[in-house]
């Protein structure tokens, strides 16, 4: 069971080094399988604003960019990308930066023109379009001004500013297959109070679900309770940035707001969930049974 320290700290104040947290949890009976610093694979990559573009004098496919990276002077970077433009906010790997694919970026010259870094694509940052749905992935990644500011560390932008601990959960502790379950154990181990929050269930424009849907549970020995709820007027869209960050940190690929919230609840509460598109529910009925 993976848990990010930032998510854990929403429930209990354990502002201690990760080594101390692991030691306490081991003493409480939990084996630590791994500890991962998400920011360790990438350094010195920041959000930069392209101030000026001009053609390379000796290469038709290269452009010379003057980029504001939050310092006193713009940084010059030569790129072969054709999707960049003046005013674009882009990931800039500066001199002596390191990328998740193992690349070590240093300043140099491209066809005789000084280049003090590299502009980065999704792949070069270790991402795919599934990590950030709804974003055009070809060429250099064009950042959203609402998600970051000039000079901001890209690790912060993509949610890599976190540490993830993977605990082995034994079969006799199913209550710890969740963020809240592990937070409860951490609170007990450190003698700290646990911060609880009660979910608020709002009404739905869909009315009574059983006016629209029938649920049959023949496999009662395997599933003694199945709860369903219908939500109307749903708009499928990318999830908020904070939610995508938490999912990625805990090893879950973001898809869209509906799928992501079911996965989020599963991780936080340990309650498996699934969302169905009502248009494709055959005969308006859900049957919970063993596979045939």
Language model segments and positions:
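Glycine/proline-enriched, intrinsically flexible loops and inter-domain linkers
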Residues: 5, 23, 63, 190, ...
């Amino acid at each position: 069971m993976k848990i990010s320290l930032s998510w854990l700290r929403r429930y209990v104040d354990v502002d201690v080094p990760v080594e101390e947290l692991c030691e306490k949890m081991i003493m409480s009976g939990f084996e630590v399988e791994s500890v991962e610093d998400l920011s360790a694979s990438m350094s010195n990559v920041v959000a930069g604003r392209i101030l000026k573009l001009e053609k390379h004098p000796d290469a038709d496919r290269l452009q010379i960019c003057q980029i504001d990276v939050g310092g006193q002077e713009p940084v010059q970077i030569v790129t072969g990308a054709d999707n960049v433009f003046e005013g674009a906010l882009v990931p800039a790997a500066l001199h002596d930066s390191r990328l998740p694919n193992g690349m070590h970026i240093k300043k140099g010259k491209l066809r005789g023109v000084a280049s003090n870094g590299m502009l980065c694509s999704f792949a070069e940052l270790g991402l795919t379009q599934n990590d950030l749905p709804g974003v055009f992935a070809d060429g250099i990644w064009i950042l959203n001004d609402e998600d970051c500011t000039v000079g901001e560390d890209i690790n912060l932008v993509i949610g890599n500013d976190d540490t993830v601990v993977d605990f082995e959960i034994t079969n006799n502790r199913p209550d710890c297959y969740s963020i809240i379950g592990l937070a409860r154990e951490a609170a007990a181990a450190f003698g700290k109070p646990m911060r609880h929050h009660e979910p608020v269930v709002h009404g739905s424009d869909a009315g009574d679900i059983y006016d629209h849907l029938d649920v049959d549970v023949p496999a009662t020995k395997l599933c003694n309770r199945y709860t369903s709820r219908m939500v109307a007027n749903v708009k499928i869209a990318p999830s908020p940035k904070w939610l995508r960050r938490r999912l990625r940190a805990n090893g879950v690929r973001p898809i869209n707001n509906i799928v992501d919230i079911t996965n989020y609840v599963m991780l936080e509460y340990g309650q498996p969930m699934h969302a169905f598109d009502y248009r494709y529910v055959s005969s308006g009925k859900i049957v919970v049974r063993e596979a045939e």
